[in-house]
Swiss-Prot record:
Belongs to the eukaryotic/archaeal RNase P protein component 2 family. It comes from the Archaea. GO terms for cellular component: cytoplasm; ribonuclease P complex. This is Ribonuclease P protein component 2. GO terms for biological process: tRNA 5'-leader removal. Pfam families: RNase_P_Rpp14. Consists of a catalytic RNA component and at least 4-5 protein subunits.
Amino acid sequence: MNSIQLIIDIILILWILILTVLYFKRRQLNVDIVKNKKIIRAKRYIVFYVISEYKVKGDDLERVIRNSLKDLLGSVWLNIANPKVVTYREDTQEGIISTNRVGYKAVLASLPFAKEINNNKILIVPRRTTGSLKKAKKLIGLK
């Protein structure tokens, strides 16, 4: 009877040891994934143009884009995406919005909700999303 109990105890101890080792390996793996901040910092640039009867200023455009994102998904996604109008050409009404890799789809989804600037109706149409500012500037005809 004692020998059977001893064997069961040894098997249980080995089982607990194996589970503990697997748990710590998994925990260590998750920590390595979280430390990778490149995913969050990677930039995306959205090239867009504005359809409007009147000329639109870049500052007003950024304010409207930020408000539409806040109305659609809330202030948490506004802080995550942090959209900024990097370049805006008032003559052709084309521009570039800078955001990060996590929030660029949220910014794209909120662009149709930006409908009005200073009681003038507008429509913001995204043309392309790129990973480099140089390529985005080339698409709107700068440099």
